[in-house]
C-alpha cells in the first residue's frame, strides 16, 4: 500500500436515488426555528455546483444531497434572547437597588433631622430657667437676709419652703387675698359723708347739661318753664316732644334761641350784616321785589288778562323761534322797501320762503 492509499478520504456523493447504496447518505433534517437559513450562501453554492454538474452531465439537473459537518454558534437566536433577558434583569435589579438606596437615604435624613430637633428642644428646655426656680431663689435670698438680721432661730416649719405650684401657661389670674377684699368691702359700705359746706365736684356730663340748659335771666317765662322741665331732676327728660313744646319755641329768632341753649351769651361778634326787610311771601333768599302784579298762576299770560306781564303791557312769555324769524323777516322787508332795493329776484326768494313755511 502506498501513502496515498493509507490516508482517509472524505467524499461527498451527489446523485439520484438510483446511485449505489454505498454512497447513500441520510437526508438532512429540516432546520428548526432557532436556526437561520442562509439563502444567499446556499443559492451561490447551489448555482456554482449546478454549473459543474451541468458540465459533467451535459446540462441535465439532478437532485443533490448535502452533508452537514458542523454547526455554527454565532447565529443561535436562543442564546441572544437569553443574553437580552439577563441584561434586562440586571438593569432592573440595578434600578431597584438605586431606588431602595435613595428611599433609605431619605428616611435616614428624616430620622437624623428629627433626632437633631429633639436634641435642640431638650437643650433649650434644660438651659431655660423656669419661673418657679426664680421664685424659689428669691425666697431663699429673702429668708437668708431676714435670718442674718434677726439672729434668732426659727421653727423648722417656717424654714420649709412652700410647695411651688406647677407652671400654668396662657392667661394667669392672681387671686386677691381675703383681707384686702374685706377691707375694700367695708370701705364701700361706709362712704364718707360730705360736709354741708363742701359741694361734690360736678362730672363732665353734669357740666355739659348745665351749659346747655343755662339761659339768660331776661328770657321769657316759657324758656324758664322749659328749663325747669328739662332740668336733670325731671322725670320726663327722655320723652318725645309734643305740640306744646314746639309752640313754646319762638319762630322769630329761632337760630338765636337755639344758640342760647347751647351756651351763647347773645352778643354778636365780628362783622354782621343787618337784615332791614323781610322777604315776600313764597320768595327765596336773594329774590328781588316784583314791580308788577304778583300771581303765581298767571305765568305766560298777558297783563290784559289776569296779569303776568310787565308794567308796559308786553307779553312776558318766552319768544318762540318761528316768531323770532318772522319778526326778523318783516324788519328786513321794511328796510328794503324803505331804501328801494326790492327786485324781482328778492320777490321770488320771499315767495319760496313763504311756501316753505306753509
Swiss-Prot record:
Bias class Basic and acidic residues marks the residues at 80-137, 145-160, 233-246, 309-358
Task: Extract the Pfam families matched here.
Answer: G-patch_2 (PF12656)
BP GO annotations = mRNA processing; RNA splicing
Q: Where is this region: Disordered?
A: 1-250, 298-358
Locations listed in the record: Nucleus
- What is any one of the record's Gene Ontology cellular component terms? spliceosomal complex
Primary site of residence: nucleus
Compositionally biased spans, kind Polar residues = 174-185
User: In which domain of life is the source organism classified?
Assistant: Eukaryota
> Which keywords appear in this protein's UniProt record, sorted alphabetically?
mRNA processing, mRNA splicing, Nucleus, Spliceosome
In the UniProt record, does the keyword Signal occur? no
Residue spans of biased composition, Basic residues class = 24-40
Q: Which InterPro entries match?
A: Spp2/MOS2_G-patch
Outline what the protein does. Involved in spliceosome maturation and the first step of pre-mRNA splicing.
Hey, which family's this protein in?
Belongs to the SPP2 family.
Subunit and interaction comment: Associated with the spliceosome.
What protein name applies here? Answer: Pre-mRNA-splicing factor spp2
Taxonomic source organism: Neurospora crassa (strain ATCC 24698 / 74-OR23-1A / CBS 708.71 / DSM 1257 / FGSC 987)
Identify the coding gene.
Answer: msp-40
